[in-house]
Regions:
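Short, Lys/Arg-enriched N-terminal segments with co-localized hydrophobic residues
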Residues: 1-4
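Short, charge-rich amphipathic segments
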Residues: 6-19, 42, 61-73, 184-209
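Histidine/acidic residue-rich metal-binding segments in metalloenzymes
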Residues: 17-124, 128-146
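Glycine-rich, acidic/polar active-site loops that bind/position phosphate-bearing ligands
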Residues: 149-210
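N-terminal hydrophobic targeting/anchoring segments and the immediately downstream early-domain regions
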Residues: 6-17, 21-27, 146-167
């Protein structure tokens, strides 16, 4: 068996050396012309969202302010309009489970309208939360195997982006009990803790620092 495994390892290395670099064509001469083209950044938010919604979303991104569900509906509408204009037909909650990779839950923008036709739909409810099957992901022993429910929740601090024909929405992945099942949720908690500690230190020099 050890001899077979050694041969397999050599074959893997040999195959890896045979791979050639993929040629990538530059979309334009100036990076500024295509940088962020497929990212729903603040520029796109300002263009596709009402001013009240834009300001609320920016407040959530910059200051961690909570978002009302009605705001989420309008964000979803603007995000869907931009994505469809860019050629997207599907959307996915994109997260980083404890497998040192990424995972996605794909859905199409189109839904049956109940009258024999189709309609494009993407609501705030679909943007904010999805329910992927968590049974196939590591959980660190925090739950029983049969407790397979997991939730992916939208993270407004990371901008949505398009890959091919899919709108990717960055999310955190948690168990139904609230424990983190991904790498991102602990990082966000750590960032908030560091931010709070830094502000406390800054108050020694300037009480108005927020």
């Amino acid at each position: 068996k050890s001899g077979i495994m050694s041969k397999l390892r050599f074959r893997v290395v040999e195959t890896a050396f045979k791979k050639k670099a993929v040629e990538v064509a530059t979309p334009a001469e100036r990076p500024s012309e295509y940088f962020g083209k497929y990212v729903f950044n603040k520029e796109k938010m300002f263009k596709y969202l009402p001013s009240k919604v834009y300001n609320a979303l920016i407040d959530a991104i910059d200051n961690g302010a909570p978002l009302d569900r009605s705001i989420a509906d309008e964000v979803a509408a603007g995000m869907k309009k931009w994505a469809i204009e860019m050629g997207a037909t599907h959307y996915t909650h994109w997260f980083a489970p404890l497998t040192e990779g990424t995972a996605e839950k794909h859905d199409a923008f189109v839904e049956h309208d109940g009258k024999g036709g189709m309609m494009e739909e993407f609501t705030g409810k679909l943007l904010v939360q999805q329910e992927p099957d968590a049974s196939s992901f590591p959980n660190g022993g925090i739950r029983n195997t049969f407790e397979a429910r997991g939730y992916s929740a939208w993270d407004p601090s990371s901008p949505a982006f398009i890959v091919d024909d899919t709108l990717c929405i960055p999310t955190v992945f948690i168990a139904y009990t609230g424990e983190a099942l991904d790498y991102k949720a602990p990082l966000l908690k750590a960032l908030r803790a560091v931010d709070k500690a830094a502000v406390d230190v800054c108050h020694y020099f300037n009480p108005e620092v927020k």
